[in-house]
Amino acid sequence: MTKIIVGAGITGLYLAYKLIKYKDINPNDILIIEKSDRVGGRIYTYQNKGYKYDVGAGRLGKKQKLVMRLIKEFNLTDKIYDITGDKNYFIDNKLLNEKELLKYYDSKFSSISKLWKYVIDYKSNLDLTKMNFHNYVSTFLSTNEVKILDRSLGYVNEIYRLNAYDAIYTLKKDFDVEDNSFFILMGGLSIIYEKIYEFLKEKNVKIILNCDLLDIDDKNKTIKTNKENYKYSELYLAICKKGYMTIPYFNNHKELLDSVSVGNLLRIYAKYDVKKNKWIKDIKKTLTDNKLQFIIPIDNKSGLIQISYTDDYIANFWNVLTTKQIKINLVKYLKEIFPNENVTEPEWITKHYWCCGAHFWKVGKNSRKIQKQIEKTFKPKKIYVIGEIYSSRQAWIEGSLETVEKLLK
């Protein structure tokens, strides 16, 4: 009988790989359906004008055990390229390094990581699920210390949307607030899913693209898609929240499944003429309080840069602009940071918007209880909810892989 996996992102591919390699499942008994026209989901290495760059998932952490294991398994260790932790901060029209940022906010902490360590280790009697991270830290830190946290993390979703309990957990596990060492993979992160995809193709696993799940009939163990109906013995769902909110089968479970919010993300890559834009030569990763949010250097010598990485309402700001309007605004916001430098419009840009870039446990929701409730509701029907969406490490590949490992234990 067929095990159907819905979603050919890293979660679905990893599950199929594990079922075949470690659970001795016959590859002919696995069917993967994917609503888009490509595999890989939110891992996407884009190719443009001779350049390759990641426009979806951007980085991995050495503390992420499952990711590290996968890299070793596919002999990709030599592709690891460490990211420097050195950053600048553009705050109130001032470009500051870490020491200057701490001094600007009159901090009693000697480093940002020491402030984060204090926050993560702080013991509180409050119910952290009932407030967002910003409100939680405001109960025991000064206004200025809270501003340092806000400015040094930079994300809207993690600070204002995610509940504080899950924010602390993921900050501790996955962010570079406590010297977590991050890296990218040379040639792009897509190599991870491509290796799994190659394995599945060699095993002749059937993968159907442009195949959208429309409904589920758990009595007859059948799924309805835009192509045809398929019978399953077990159904694995690696889909985003929109699927759970629109598929009729889940209508009676909306309150349970609506416990996460959807975080949108947007990356803008730009290629500059380095002779006319001297500012690009020594630019570091820069967190800004203007609409650029994050500036992430890619190749300073050639002039390729991720000129803006944004989330939430800031991502929406850029997404509605035309290419010309984006170029004009890039000049405007860069001139704020480099008022004495010549800043031209980029030669070209590419914009990459993810309406479901990540998911975040809502304020007032107890993630651990909800995870158990989801399992209790669907597991008896041989339906399994997996992926980053309801994981303990949302917005990270590691969260997706953890849900697969937990399922197969």
Please state what every model-predicted region is.
Residues 51-118, 122:
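Dinucleotide-binding Rossmann-like beta1-alpha1 core, especially the glycine-rich loop
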Residues 11, 38, 242:
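Conserved Rossmann-like nucleotide-cofactor binding loop
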Residues 120-212, 221, 238, 243-248:
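Active-site/ligand-binding neighborhood in enzyme catalytic cores
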Residues 14, 282, 289-409:
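Conserved flavin/dinucleotide-binding core of flavoenzymes
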Residues 20-47:
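Glycine-rich FAD pyrophosphate-binding loop
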Residues 218-223, 228-280:
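Central helical "cap/lid" subdomain
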Residues 1-11:
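Beta1/beta-strand and adjacent pyrophosphate-binding region of the FAD-binding site
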